[in-house]
Amino acid sequence: MSLGLDPNDPDEVCLDVYQEHFETPFIVGTVQYYTQESALFLAENSVTDYLKKAEDRLREEEDRVQRSLCTNTRNKLISQCEHVLIREHAELLWGSFKSLLDCDKEEDLHRMYTLLSRIPEGLEPLRRCFEAHVKQASLSAISRLIGQEGNTDSLDPKAYVDALLEVHQKHFETVNSSFKGEAGFEASFDKACREFVNRNAATGTSSARSSGLIAKYADMLLKKNSKVAEEDDLESKLGHVVSTTFFPCSDRFLSTILGDPLQVS
């Protein structure tokens, strides 16, 4: 690039002229353009459409740098584009996250996750919202199971565990597909699971109530699957029920019930 050659030393790259007369004005112009475009686009389109638009624009800028610009320009240009396309609209994106969760918009969730992961602290509000969403989903599932009467004495252990596992499996898949198993989302998910399994409409204020129902279900599985040929399948089922998502000491609990079937009246 001729703008970057030092006339006194052709082998030495000097970018002062390039930066002053091209790079800086180019980045300023790009920021101005995207500031106006993003505001107009959001005024006329949905947030989910904007996620696609921002994704496309960032990809185009990456391609432009690779094709036509000095590699030193990349970080400066992309960071400014991320600021104007994502950071400037982060509040709106965060505020739309819950509706995407409620409607199971997996692709849009992944797109929002990917975009917000590009800015500092962009994911933390999403993690908090996801944790609250998982807890509410499980609490609602158990409340529906118990019904309006609120009688927990006759609660079927299998139905209780199935309700927990259904919520767990659904949101576990969301963590791994939409959020790519990101550690912060995994931590939020684990925290939500530990809280809802110990505090819900079936347990009241006693976490022992939940472990008792799960123990009854484990005992039912043991009695139903007593054949040696089914031992591996049984251990898999029990391991899923008492996974570390639910119990910090699940390995010890699992070995205990496998070694000595519970006698639960």
Language-model regions: role of each:
Residues M1-S265:
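Eukaryotic scaffold/interaction segments
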